[in-house]
C-alpha cells in the first residue's frame, strides 16, 4: 500500500469509528421510522441527485437488503445522461416535483433524502414534498459542509425528522497532495453507504424478530429465485424499478 492509499484508508476508518458512536442515537431513530413504515405496509423512498443517487441504487433490490425500499431514479438528476446538465438541473426550483409525482409517496411512508451539501433546490424540494404528503424525512448530509456554504439558504437538515451527519468535510475530498492546491479522495459515498446499510440492517433484525422481514437473497445463492420472485410480486405495484 502506498503512502496516499494508506492515508485514505486511515481517514475513512477513523471517520467510521467516530460515526459508530456519535450517530448511534440518530441511526436508531432512523431505524424506528423505517420499521414503523414496514409494519404499516408503507414504503421507504430514497432520493439523491448527482453522486448521491448511488445511495438509492445501493438500497434497491440489494442482496441482504429490504424490499420495502424504492429508489427515485431519473436520468436528469443522475450522471449518465450528462453530468454537467444534472448539476444544473438540481439547482432549478420546481424541477423535481414532476419526478416525485410518479412514485405515489403518501402518509406513513419514509423519504430518505441524500445530499452532501444539503442546500441545492432538488433535495430541499424533495423534503418539502414529502412533508406535504405526510411522509417522514430522513436526511443524510454533511452538517459541516452544509453550514459552511448555506449563507442564509434553507438547509436540508432543518427540514428532516432525523439527520444522519456523514462527517464528510467541506468539499468532500480529504487528502492533500504535495504540489497541488486541490484535494483528492472523496469520502461521502463510503461513509453514507455504511450508515444506511447499518440502519437497514437494524430494521431487518427488528422485522425478523417480529416474523416478517422482506429480505432479498443474492441471485447466485440457492433458493434465491423463489424468495426474490415472491418479494417482487409483493412490492411491484409500489416500485416501478422492479
UniProtKB/Swiss-Prot annotation:
Gene3D superfamilies linked to this entry: Glucose-6-phosphate isomerase like protein, domain 1 (3.40.50.10490)
Pfam families per record: SIS_2
SIS domain segment(s): 30-214
Record-linked InterPro entries: RpiR-like_SIS (IPR035472), SIS_dom (IPR001347), SIS_dom_sf (IPR046348), SIS_GmhA/DiaA_subfam (IPR050099), UPF0309 (IPR022951)
GO annotation terms (biological process): carbohydrate derivative metabolic process
GO molecular function: carbohydrate derivative binding
HAMAP family attached to this UniProt entry: UPF0309
Similarity annotation: Belongs to the UPF0309 family.
PANTHER family on file: PHOSPHOHEPTOSE ISOMERASE, SEDOHEPTULOSE 7-PHOSPHATE ISOMERASE / DNAA INITIATOR-ASSOCIATING FACTOR FOR REPLICATION INITIATION
Protein name in UniProt: UPF0309 protein BAB2_0325
